């Protein structure tokens, strides 16, 4: 009997992979509900069919709080087996976009050379609709990023070596009262040394931090993740425009001061704004690629001691840190299209056009 009880307890423990107590979620301590494959064999890409029935970053999803909630996929880079470097692809709601923007698409990377860099796409992302996220190594230390089979623009992570030694997909949230009801399906990986794709992340296990949760629904290809999925919001679910916490029309300097505050620096210094193009700004921060649009952009740069509390990072990865914070603000709309933290100053001479 004792042996049977011990065996039962051991089996239960095996199912409860990396489950943490309910400490709460914050911008400095994100919560997750994922399936994760650490120290995987060498891979060169990943695919996940992502869907959300609900994605709200807080109990007040139409109010700007600096929080976000994501449904996403990470593919490790540079031989990292646990999340030091990566490319990610998925959907988000909340910061750095205004709460009124609703759900948007994004991708981001963290590279050995240049730190964290995020790219947001203000497009219509619907609930209960499947979107295919794909990340694929193309050689020359570069990865292409796709949504539904289409290369994003921008959509190339450069100076980011292969191989991948971890794959992960699921939810990430910065607020204990976030609401997520998501799924991932048809998980694939690309084998070493070729273009062969195969289904199943056979080495992955559910990982969650309460109140988030995740589990396989058809291992090792399909999973679900949830976080307060059925709790009623204080506001209606229909997204609508709200007044930003920043008064007046979009102001790049005000935006970077707010970004600095949210990323641990109350007194940023030597703030500089340069009128340029998005492509030139990418080149200036070491991310130049042919697929970056030539749209007019304000590159805003600040210095200080920044910790990327607002960075979308895999569980267990340290928040990106650096002395340089930069935003790319669309000159027409005032929307933040890209932002990053680095220890490398932008090459300002590259942005003049």
Residue ranges, per PLM feature:
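Secretory targeting and sorting signals
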Residues: 1-22
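Exposed, interaction-prone regions of secreted/extracellular proteins
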Residues: 22-244, 330-333, 344
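Short, solvent-exposed secondary-structure boundary motifs
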Residues: 71-79, 264, 315-319
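Short hydrophobic/aromatic-rich beta-strand segments that constitute the beta-sheet cores
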Residues: 145, 308-309, 336-339
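N-terminal trafficking/processing presequences and adjacent post-cleavage segments
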Residues: 243-277
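Exposed beta-strand-loop-beta-strand "reactive/processing" segments of non-cytosolic proteins
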Residues: 268-327
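A short, surface-exposed interaction/processing loop segment used at functional sites
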Residues: 314-353
């Amino acid at each position: 009997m004792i042996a049977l009880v011990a065996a039962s307890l051991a089996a239960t423990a095996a199912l409860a992979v990396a489950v943490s107590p309910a400490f709460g979620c914050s911008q400095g301590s994100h919560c997750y509900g994922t399936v994760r494959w650490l120290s995987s064999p060498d891979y060169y890409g990943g695919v996940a069919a992502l869907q959300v029935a609900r994605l709200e970053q807080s109990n007040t999803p139409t109010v700007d709080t600096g929080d976000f909630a994501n449904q996403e996929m990470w593919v490790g880079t540079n031989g990292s087996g646990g999340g030091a470097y990566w490319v990610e692809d998925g959907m988000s709601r909340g910061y750095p976009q205004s709460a009124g923007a609703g759900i948007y698409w994004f991708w981001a990377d963290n590279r050995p050379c240049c730190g964290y860099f995020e790219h947001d796409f203000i497009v219509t992302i619907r609930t209960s609709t499947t979107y295919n996220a794909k990340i694929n190594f193309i050689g020359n230390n570069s990865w292409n990023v796709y949504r539904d089979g289409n290369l994003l623009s921008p959509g190339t992570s450069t100076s980011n070596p292969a191989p991948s030694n971890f794959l992960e997909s699921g939810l990430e949230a910065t607020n204990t009262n976030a609401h997520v009801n998501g799924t991932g399906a048809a998980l694939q990986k690309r084998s070493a040394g070729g273009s062969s794709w195969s289904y199943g992340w056979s080495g992955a296990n559910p990982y969650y931090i309460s109140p988030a949760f995740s589990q396989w629904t058809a291992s090792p290809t399909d999973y679900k993740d949830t976080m307060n999925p059925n709790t009623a919001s204080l506001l209606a679910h229909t997204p609508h425009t709200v007044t930003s916490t920043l008064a007046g029309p979009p102001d790049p300097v005000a935006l970077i001061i707010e970004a600095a505050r949210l990323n641990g620096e109350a007194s940023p210094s030597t703030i500089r704004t340069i009128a340029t193009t998005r492509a030139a700004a990418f080149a200036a921060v070491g991310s130049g690629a042919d697929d970056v649009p030539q749209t007019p952009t304000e590159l805003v740069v600040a210095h200080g001691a920044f910790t990327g509390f607002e960075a979308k990072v895999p569980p267990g990865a340290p928040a990106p840190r650096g002395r340089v914070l930069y935003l790319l603000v669309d000159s027409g709309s005032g929307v933040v299209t890209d932002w990053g933290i680095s220890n490398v100053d932008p090459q300002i001479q590259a942005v003049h056009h």
